Amino acid sequence: MTFRTDCLEFLGDRPCKPHKLRGRTCDTCPEFMKEKGRLLLIKLGALGDVVRTLPLLEALSKAYQGYKIWVITQRPSIPFFLANPFVGRAILLEHAPLFLSQVSFRIAANLDLDPTACASIGLAKADQKLGFGLDSTGNIVPLDDRASAWYAMSLDDTTKRANHATYQQHMARILGVPFHNEAIRIEPGQKRLNLAKELLHEAGLHPSQRPLIGLNTGSSGRWPLKTPPVEHFVELIRLLDAQGLTPVTLLGGRDELPKNQAIAEAFQKKAIVLDVRQDVLEFAALIAWHNLIVTGDTLSLHLALAFNVRVVAVFGPTSAQEIELYGLGTKLVGNVPCIGCYTSSCEKKPTCMDTISPKEIFGAILNELSFSRRPANP
């Protein structure tokens, strides 16, 4: 038997999908698609940053039909890339040098202003390198003019605040491909979706019967000011309860568990703590069953958008302009002159998040629910 290693479906270590699903044999397969070459994307950022990058994979796939997309990333992000239909292979960062020493690419792109990511693209054998790399002194630099705008925004606060383009638009420009609001594609699998539904049912939540609202109380450790203060969530739950919109779910990571449990105890069964963050795709599946998520600029926001869940997104230290909501929500931005400061701590009072009142969030929720006609059924 002959094996076509130049097929886009070829895996090398296990049977391909056409063989497993339809019994095709390699030497006579009518589904053979010749691999024209490979594209490399290096993405090492935080999980939310990784998820908002996923639409670019589809844009690349359209622009370079017949090319297999390889991704180099860190271990926590691997599940999201493997759950995206446009990724041909996902490589762990620690294994990257072995592959980069042997595999050649048509294009290698690094979208992160990160020294390790920039050093990695320097190892790649590619006809063209895009994004960011290191110069001979070890400093991060744009690899061509298309990356200069994002580079300037990252180094100059005035330029950053003047920006009106989304992250995806900027990255598509760096990659040299059109961006037509391609969606965030994540396929967690029916098993995870069913498990998430069972978890909700065990908590007494039945999203098919009434709107299910999730409150994400967390943010990454780097940006603690991305989320409203606890007292705002407490007041918001009171407002939602008076409107008959409880119980709500309380979402977050391990760091938010004590905070969420304290809030839940104050409201008994009107606020339910959901803790499935061990598996990021389980967390994604759980988000998918909601009708609306209240969240800062963090992972929950981008996961909600991936599953067409309405959002009320609050912004303080990070840029609201960069976030593409796909027509699925409302942005509430703190009312302070230093908005979008990108600082991890702040001594000012009130903070940017303090200026976004629970009543303002509540009003946005009611407005978004009026647009949410979908049953919570991914």
Segments the model singles out, each with a brief description of its role:
Residues 1-378:
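Catalytic machinery of carbohydrate-active enzymes
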